[in-house]
Amino acid sequence: MELRKSQVAMPVFLAIMSLMVSQVVFAEKDSGSMSPHDRALAEMQALKASLVRRNLPALVSPPPTPPQAVPGPRVYQVISYGADPTGKLDSTDAILKAMEEAFDGPNHGVLMQGINDLGGARIDLQGGSYLISRPLRFPSAGAGNLLISGGTLRASNDFPVDRYLIELKDESSKLQYIFEYITLRDLLIDCNYRGGAIAVINSLRTSIDNCYITRFGDTNGILVKSGHETYIRNSFLGQHITAGGDRGERSFSGTAINLMGNDNAVTDTVIFSARIGVMVSGQANLLSGVHCYNKATGFGGTGIYLRLPGLTQNRIVNSYLDYTGIVAEDPVQLQISGTFFLGDAFILLKSIAGYIRGVSIVDNMFSGSGHGVQIVQLDQRNTAFDDVGQVVVDRNSVNGMVEKSTVARGSVDGNGTSWTVDFNPVLLFPDLINHVQYTLVASEAGVFPLHALRNVSDNRVVVETNAPVTGTVYVTVNQGV
């Protein structure tokens, strides 16, 4: 468009200049022989020409301004660094080079102290499948706001068995946190039964989203150690690729997710094969929407293992334990609610030093095979739970299993002076009743016997009257108050 304007303006310019020259020449040539009237007319034409000459630049379009160069998005495509998307050749060096250039790219300030904001740089695996022979790591600590996504990583046959394909770690760093806001998304990581998939060490606000992690060795699929706020969501993890009922289930090993830090979350995630689904040894973690059918309890598997005796402070909500259960050591401040336990899956409270306080196991569903498996069990082989407080096991829906609770209600009919209600089949803890309420209803009109609570030992409540009476005793007991 600018070129066409220039082409149109140029003839106009030449015509005007020609007219102006002819008018001026004519005026100078004949001014001596002109009449006063003609001379005045010529002077007016000369004035008009000068005005046109003054405004002439406005009639001619200036040449177009060359477009300014716009920086392209900082997407580091690994194929351009020599990575082989077919998975036939080792792509480790090429991907490490892309990670190095992303790390050294322009920054947009800092996040936490010592961590450069890389402005949302992306390392794009371009939908390829890449053979990896050693861990993928950044050159050093100090990177943040970066995404790695969109492809498959497969461990080579000589990948170190004690390492992880992606490692966010730097043993030499003195920073409080070494990485921040690193996102791993849309990845399939095949560990080839060598090492693990992802290690997040002392990092802050890390996201692992929509990842499929499989064939990890007798180690961890994902390891989170120290740091804060690693969020694992919408992901699938399994040592062996199966959909349940696998003939080799007895031999499943390894741990799918190992949380050795605080303030992390695992949400909407499936764990389909491993000896332990989720191991937790840090406080203030949240597990929500987690489906574990990693290895049946009868084969030695555990869905979720809480190994932090004395200060648990974790929540398991709205999850699904499928033929595998939960183990908690000396739990203090633990919530398990809204969770479905299928196939005789149960909760085991394991005594290490005898502490259990602030535990809430409520509003869950348990479904079993009718073989007499208790929904909540105690392991007191090390020592008995002798420090019990604020424990509530109640309002659980039970089908085909034995209900256990810290709150129980019972009644007994009789004709005499003593009524005994045995709560051992229901109460969770042996020989522990902290609170009792009872009501005696006499069947005979006009009878007002004296009555009293005489004994609550061995989880049995005994009520006696001063005279024989026909009636019913209703009792409510609580172990957790």
From Swiss-Prot:
Glycosylation: residue positions: N415, N455
Reaction equation(s) it catalyzes: (1,4-alpha-D-galacturonosyl)n+m + H2O = (1,4-alpha-D-galacturonosyl)n + (1,4-alpha-D-galacturonosyl)m
Protein name: Polygalacturonase QRT3
Origin species: Arabidopsis thaliana
Entry's Gene Ontology cellular component terms: extracellular region
Top-level division of the source organism's lineage: Eukaryota
Ranges of the PbH1 repeats in the UniProt entry: 203-226, 261-282, 356-377
InterPro entries found in the cross-reference section: Pectin_lyas_fold (IPR012334), Pectin_lyase_fold/virulence (IPR011050), QRT3-like (IPR039279)
Subcellular location: Secreted, Cell wall
GO terms of molecular function: polygalacturonase activity
Gene Ontology biological-process annotations: cell wall organization; microsporogenesis; pollen exine formation
Signal sequence annotation: 1-27
Keyword Mitochondrion: no
Expression sites (tissue/organ): Expressed in the tapetum cells in the anthers and in the ovules of open flowers.
